[in-house]
């Protein structure tokens, strides 16, 4: 949840002021699941939601014009943060959404975990939550969001990034 930009200047290049030109054809907002994702944010009017391939990203609306200009002028590796991934006819929330302060926790079924189960989740170990509803669940520890799982009844598919898992304690 921050704004970062990096630019390099070659020696001998001219420097000067910079203005963002007005766009003649603004980029259209065509996100199929946009209404669903807006419920995931406490203040959806403060965010711009865009689809990039099968991923959906969000960034602060106040930077919309700047980000669209930079995307049109440069090859941007990443803009915003991932809030969802389109998988067939469904959308799966991404882990970055669970870390957002503007996350609307009421939009998801929440499951409070014990310390042992929270550590098990963060190790990407198998979890079973038979008492919880089926579907996407927001896991919390002491009311702090940890991430998402997809509960399919007899087990949960862990949506925590594998490269972030705890290997040793």
What are these regions (language model features)?
Residues 3-13:
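Conserved beta strand-loop-helix elements of the APE1-like EEP
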Residues 11-169:
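Polybasic, low-complexity RNA-engagement segments
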Residues 1-3, 134:
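A general secondary-structure signal for short beta-strands and their flanking turns/coil
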